[in-house]
Amino acid sequence: MLLSAIRKKGFTLVEMLVTLTIVSILALAILPLAKTAVKREREITLKRNLRMMREAIDAYKKLADEKAFEFDEDTEGYPPDLETLVEGIEAKMEANEDNEEVTKVIKFMRRIPKDPMTNSYDWGLRSYQDDPDSDIWGGENIYDVFTKSPGTALDGTKYKEW
């Protein structure tokens, strides 16, 4: 009688092994899904960062085309580096009520974002004068940015081509 009461209180070794096997199989099935979710999140962050920097470059170019500030003609109106987009420029704004031209510092980005694929702040840069397929930056200006990651996205495209 005492022996049967002890058996009912605990698990047998077989029950523990079966439970451990089932949990292991479930964990192995979920692992690829978790890796895909992490990769997808990094891709979303990369797209967001690229879009933010490209919009900042476009805003800088628009002000240059409007002659709102002085720039070196060799740059074609594009920023000379990413730091310029963070530090900002002194732009001439519309006249105030005294018909005086007002100068204002305009910043295009708060900071240079981190590349989620390379985990660094080092981005691939392309100038207006560079070949569109070139990975080498001429240094004249910044026309476009891209990641330096050689990886392939979930949709099969190369990250460098984004």
Locations of the language-model features?
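N-terminal leader/signal peptides at the extreme start of proteins
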Residues: 1-9
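Internal alpha-helical transmembrane segments of multi-pass membrane proteins, especially GPCRs
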Residues: 9, 15-18
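Alpha-helical hydrophobic helix detector
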Residues: 17-32
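Transmembrane signal-anchor/signal-peptide helices with a preference for the extracytoplasmic
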Residues: 29-41
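Membrane-proximal N-terminal amphipathic helix
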Residues: 38-65, 77
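Low-complexity, acidic interaction segments enriched in glycine
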Residues: 58-162
